[in-house]
């Protein structure tokens, strides 16, 4: 059993589709989970139809959604790191490393969950996960936590091979769907299909939601 899990993502909702089930499992097992979210996703373009937010109010909307998602998963320790959305690739890498390093020093996690650097599609995803890996590379090997890395590019298996860990999360599917629903500003169309039953339970999307796959990051010594 893990002694402490640290989840590091750049945006609210990054945890919802690929990791919410595993996070919930850890919480249910009594494992302490800390979720560090680098930004509030305040530059997101989806503000609803009809509009539920303006550019000025969107940060608070997404902050509340993130808090609701954590409540759904049972995560009590949410850290909002205060970086600006869509700018992580332009931040001083040392500032990102320092910020994450302080969390690692404080929490001493046995496992970190983040995106897989260079396979995150979004520049913020790659910058955030690269900072996590750089932080850990500077640690003594014997103190370094395991990293469950989440690649989301279409070619991930062709390049990286099969995932090292695949978790069936059907036993916590209800909680995972509540987590997805919490981020309504980003998932409104999917939530509508889940709520009205129009999503085929055998669809590729439902299969994706029911299983979570990770690659253990291979540190080059």
Report the location of each language-model feature:
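Active-site rim/loop-helix segments in enzyme catalytic domains that contact anionic ligands
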Residues: 1-107, 137-143
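Metal-dependent de-N-acetylase/amidase catalytic core
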Residues: 2-8, 29, 76-77, 86, ...
């Amino acid at each position: 059993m893990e002694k402490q899990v640290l989840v590091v993502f750049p945006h609210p909702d990054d945890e919802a589709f690929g990791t919410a089930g595993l996070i919930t499992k850890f919480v249910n097992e009594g494992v302490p989970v800390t979720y560090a979210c680098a930004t509030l996703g305040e530059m997101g373009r989806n503000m609803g139809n009809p509009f539920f937010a303006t550019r000025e109010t969107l940060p608070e909307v997404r902050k509340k959604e993130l808090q609701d998602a954590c409540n759904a998963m049972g995560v009590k320790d949410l850290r909002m790191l205060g970086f600006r959305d869509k700018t992580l690739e332009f931040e001083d890498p040392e500032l990102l490393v320092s910020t994450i390093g302080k969390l690692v020093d404080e929490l001493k996690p046995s496992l970190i969950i983040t995106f897989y650097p260079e396979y995150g599609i979004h520049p913020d995803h790659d910058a955030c996960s690269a900072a996590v890996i750089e932080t850990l590379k500077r640690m003594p090997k014997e103190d370094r936590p395991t990293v469950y890395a989440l690649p989301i590019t279409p070619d991930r298996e062709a390049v990286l091979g099969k995932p090292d860990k695949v978790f069936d999360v059907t036993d916590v599917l209800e909680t995972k769907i509540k987590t997805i629903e919490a981020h309504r500003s980003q998932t409104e169309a999917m939530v509508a299909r889940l709520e009205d039953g129009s999503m085929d339970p055998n669809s590729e999307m439902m299969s994706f939601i029911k299983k979570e796959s990770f690659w253990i990051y291979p540190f080059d010594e």
